[in-house]
């Protein structure tokens, strides 16, 4: 009888859980809040078979407010779906930078890799060309220091790396490898994502990293290929020039003995003949990426320590932010000393596309003075750190509505208790981007739908067209893992 009771409660939770999934997918914040107030354990609900949580649905659709709500309810931020993907990977895949920013503020694990391809959030962002997401994922590795770009550009400088720069940690992060030895730079170069290539190179991505034959891949370009080989296959001249300017070798050969020029010819990239046939006579001038954004680390640290959203409202704001005129000032820009609310400073760092001298600084919206870092204003109180709710769901049972007289939830401590005139309007989410490679006519993607959004296994090249001229790994038939940029494995959509 007790077992039947548990089963009955489980089915009751399933109905509420499906409602939460629908609310997370559709962006219904009020419905999601009401369901979580009724039963906070629903935050850990996962759909049958697909094992996709409400957090994955909200992240894939770009509903950053629902993502915040779920995290404040105590859901595990690094929860995986059936492919081993975290919410951070989903947000990076679809380019939802606001969701990425929210997850990074809650300290999402950026080192997690998925089960199918061994790719991290950086790989997903680079593959789909989302430079802003890529930069947010690396927020804790790029210090707010004025000479950062010059230090990274001239790694052989006699001065050596700055004490504030963890050069080894940044190098390992930017050059982490997925299955087959693929780095984020390989993926961005193949698809011609110039902004991602430029940013990765500025952050220390290696141009000599080569792919490997790991027994689980079908590599149509060839094992031992550098990012320049992949750029030659993709056919983007600017990507090739950027890589050559950073020291990529034109004579490097992969395991098949092909140079980048030979790869370009085999893929009929005739426009690259002149670029790849001879070394440039003079050094190619490089400019810093507009996404470098040096103040990002400082404002992210301040937001985590002091909070970035506001609960209490007041009819009159004392010292309001000059940008939004709603939140009270909590941070100041180093240099010009102009003050902003933390949320506006976060938005400024995440969306600024204009870079001023020194490289990576962003212009102050009030005086255009370069901003390299932000500092917290004196008197700003840190938020209290409370243990997060345990939401174990061995059997998720329905529970009565929360008493209005109960103690405040952890959500109330994630906001600064300062005054505010009106609620900040929600920031718009970027739209989904096409997963197809426009410059590779032989490459097609067959989108399958999962979690209410496109969740195509990020693979680019259809293999059946090439016949026996490309060698297939002997172990491919025994392994279900495939290198994502070079094969496609359609997965049927799951319900709800």
UniProtKB/Swiss-Prot annotation:
<keyword id="KW-0479">Metal-binding</keyword>
<feature type="repeat" description="ANK 4">
    <location>
        <begin position="180"/>
        <end position="209"/>
    </location>
</feature>
<feature type="repeat" description="ANK 2">
    <location>
        <begin position="83"/>
        <end position="112"/>
    </location>
</feature>
<dbReference type="InterPro" id="IPR050663">
    <property type="entry name" value="Ankyrin-SOCS_Box"/>
</dbReference>
<keyword id="KW-0677">Repeat</keyword>
<feature type="zinc finger region" description="RING-type">
    <location>
        <begin position="321"/>
        <end position="368"/>
    </location>
</feature>
<feature type="repeat" description="ANK 5">
    <location>
        <begin position="223"/>
        <end position="252"/>
    </location>
</feature>
<dbReference type="Pfam" id="PF13637">
    <property type="entry name" value="Ank_4"/>
</dbReference>
<feature type="repeat" description="ANK 3">
    <location>
        <begin position="117"/>
        <end position="147"/>
    </location>
</feature>
<dbReference type="InterPro" id="IPR036770">
    <property type="entry name" value="Ankyrin_rpt-contain_sf"/>
</dbReference>
<keyword id="KW-0808">Transferase</keyword>
<keyword id="KW-0863">Zinc-finger</keyword>
<keyword id="KW-0862">Zinc</keyword>
<dbReference type="Pfam" id="PF12796">
    <property type="entry name" value="Ank_2"/>
</dbReference>
<dbReference type="GO" id="GO:0016567">
    <property type="term" value="P:protein ubiquitination"/>
</dbReference>
<dbReference type="InterPro" id="IPR002110">
    <property type="entry name" value="Ankyrin_rpt"/>
</dbReference>
<dbReference type="GO" id="GO:0008270">
    <property type="term" value="F:zinc ion binding"/>
</dbReference>
<keyword id="KW-0833">Ubl conjugation pathway</keyword>
<protein>
    <recommendedName>
        <fullName>Probable E3 ubiquitin-protein ligase XBOS32</fullName>
        <ecNumber>2.3.2.27</ecNumber>
    </recommendedName>
</protein>
<dbReference type="InterPro" id="IPR001841">
    <property type="entry name" value="Znf_RING"/>
</dbReference>
<feature type="repeat" description="ANK 1">
    <location>
        <begin position="50"/>
        <end position="79"/>
    </location>
</feature>
<dbReference type="Pfam" id="PF24921">
    <property type="entry name" value="RING_XB3-XBAT31"/>
</dbReference>
<dbReference type="GO" id="GO:0016740">
    <property type="term" value="F:transferase activity"/>
</dbReference>
<keyword id="KW-0040">ANK repeat</keyword>
<dbReference type="InterPro" id="IPR056760">
    <property type="entry name" value="RING_XB3-like"/>
</dbReference>
<comment type="pathway">
    <text>Protein modification; protein ubiquitination.</text>
</comment>
<dbReference type="InterPro" id="IPR017907">
    <property type="entry name" value="Znf_RING_CS"/>
</dbReference>
